[in-house]
Amino acid sequence: MSVITLTTDFGVKDHYSGSVKGALFNELGNVNIVDISHNVSPFNIIEAAYIIENAYKNFPEGSIHILGVDSEKNPEQNHLAVKLDGHYFICADNGIMSLLSNKINPEKIIEINIHNDVISTFSVVDVFVKIAAHIYRGGSIDLVGKQKDNLKELYNINPILNEKTKEIIGNVIYVDNYENVVTNISKKLFQEFGKSQSFEINARNYKFKEIVKSYSQAIRFDVVKENRKEIGKKIALFNKNNYLELSIYKSNPLISGGASSLFGLDYRDIITIKFK
């Protein structure tokens, strides 16, 4: 049985995400719905792409992913049903799929046209739910529109390599719920460019000279527990998705702040790694 996932910028205050689930239950009965996130920053396509890219691979092939971010149809933006990496994605052609498909080519891109006469301010319920239900029942996406060969392009920022100064100049691409700062510097790039040289990571006025393998590596287990002072320690590591992440060990953003607020870092801010 397929899984239907939801990734939106609806938040949890309003009725929007509940309405989508209600419409899916109304169409399909006892369907398995998973919320990936409803807290994408409003209309932030790049943030939504980061979240869904790092989540969808954990679901079984054949899963259906509804992407409700900047989803309204207009003369410059149609709706899509895309099969990619064995999964189905239903979204607007707003560039989000180009960010997901920059590593894997889509198997099929369908421009949805069965709703051309429908004027809606809530496309996720009025259109996306119906397409998801069609796919869930075993219907072909070829029946919901016409095939197209390309996607609207949206380009993410990539790290700059300076061979002369031996630097990687990267950027913040995501800040999570713990205020951990995720950069666009991959572990592969770090290893290939750095070639095991010593390094220094610079994030505004903060410097890191070590990359740990896990959050708990910040703990001095050789010190008696009562004397440890690791809470609040700044750490750098490559996260599960192999991107360089800056963090503060066990910080609570609601009380003392996390890496983003304490380091003064936000989306697109520069992080550099200088090799010696």
Task: Give the location of each predicted region.
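N-terminal glycine-/serine-/threonine-rich phosphate-binding loop
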Residues: 1-76
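Structural motif
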Residues: 2-5, 31-34, 63-66, 79-81, ...
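Short acidic/glycine-rich loops and adjacent helix/strand connectors
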Residues: 5-6, 10, 22, 29, ...
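Active-site histidine-anchored catalytic micro-motif
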Residues: 27-28, 43-47, 60-62, 66-69, ...
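Conserved subregion of the PPM/PP2C metallophosphatase catalytic domain
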Residues: 85-88, 92-115, 175, 200-217, ...
